[in-house]
A protein has these predicted regions:
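Short glycine/proline- and aromatic-enriched beta-strand/turn motifs that initiate or cap beta-hairpins
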Residues: 22-73, 228, 234-236
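Short sequence motifs at beta-strands and strand-loop junctions characteristic
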Residues: 62-68, 115-120, 168-175, 221-225
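Outer-membrane beta-barrel translocator domains and adjoining extracellular loop/strand segments
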Residues: 43-51, 96-105, 150-162, 205-213
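A charged, solvent-exposed segment within the mature domains of Sec-exported extracytoplasmic proteins
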Residues: 129-193
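Extracellular loop and loop/strand-boundary signature of outer-membrane beta-barrel proteins
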Residues: 56-60, 106-114, 161-168, 215-221
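Gram-negative (and chloroplast) outer-membrane scaffold detector with strong preference
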Residues: 24-28, 39, 72-156, 224-237
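Predominantly the C-terminal beta-signal and adjacent terminal strand-loop region
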Residues: 93, 186-237
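Cleavable N-terminal export/targeting peptides
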Residues: 1-27
């Protein structure tokens, strides 16, 4: 009986020791995969048109759809508390609605006026609180994202084609990333990472349309304030 009890104590001690040897320590690399929910608030600045549409575009607003996509991450720990993570998601296609309250002949409501493919590769430096033996590791991060817009397709309606039927472009830009999150270490290999990021940016919009009186170009700044919610399953090696 004493031998069995002693063996049980040793087994328990081994389990406890193993469970305390979690992750996020100097030299660790953690790859992860999960989902990201992308939510964007849009602020359209004054739009200028080379033709007769400028007065019709005063007060224009836009709304970009929220989308969910697959997210990948690679985290490298330089110390037990400092790491850097590179993330990239499968580029989601977002839908942009446009409202022109003074649109007149253009109309005032243009749902699904354009579809846009969004790329946001991101690098973030992170500070992890606690120690490498903690099962829960909250963190804060600061980084940058290169945001670019591809395969922009304008809706095939007369009003939208008059504004952007020939071409539509949004300039690529670098944007700051403010990040906070929490890692739960399942064991010394597997973990769950949940985070939220805020990415504010300004992009230059250039739309070329084919109106009845000829080709016109519309330009203006669009401010995007994006909040990303991410959860991923990670593996340390």
């Amino acid at each position: 009986m004493r031998s069995i009890f002693k063996t049980s104590l040793i087994a328990c001690a081994t389990v406890i020791a193993a469970s305390s040897a979690f992750a996020q320590k100097a030299g660790d690399n953690i790859v992860s995969m999960g989902v990201a929910s992308i939510n964007t608030d849009t602020d359209v600045g004054p739009l200028t048109n080379s033709g007769q549409f400028t007065p019709l575009l005063v007060g224009s607003t836009a709304n970009i759809s929220s989308e969910t996509t697959v997210s990948f991450g690679w985290l490298h720990m330089y110390t037990d508390n400092i790491g850097a993570e590179f993330t990239l998601g499968l580029p989601p296609t977002v839908t942009q609605d446009l409202t022109t309250p003074n649109g007149g002949a253009l109309g005032t409501s243009h749902p699904a006026a354009a579809k846009i493919e969004l790329w946001t590769p991101t690098a973030v430096a992170k500070y992890f609180f606690g120690t490498s033996k903690d099962q829960w590791r909250p963190y804060v991060g600061l980084g940058a994202s290169h945001v670019s817009f591809h395969n922009i397709k304008a809706k095939q309606t007369a009003d939208v084609q008059a504004l952007a039927g020939t071409s539509a472009a949004l300039s690529s830009t670098w944007a700051p990333v403010y990040n906070a999150g929490l890692i739960y270490n399942i064991d010394d290999k597997w973990s769950i990472n949940g985070s939220v990021s805020y990415i504010p940016l300004t992009t230059k919009a250039t739309f070329v349309g084919d109106a009845a009186h000829g080709t016109t170009t519309t330009t203006g700044d669009i401010k995007l304030k994006t909040t990303d919610y991410v959860i991923r399953l990670g593996y340390r090696f």
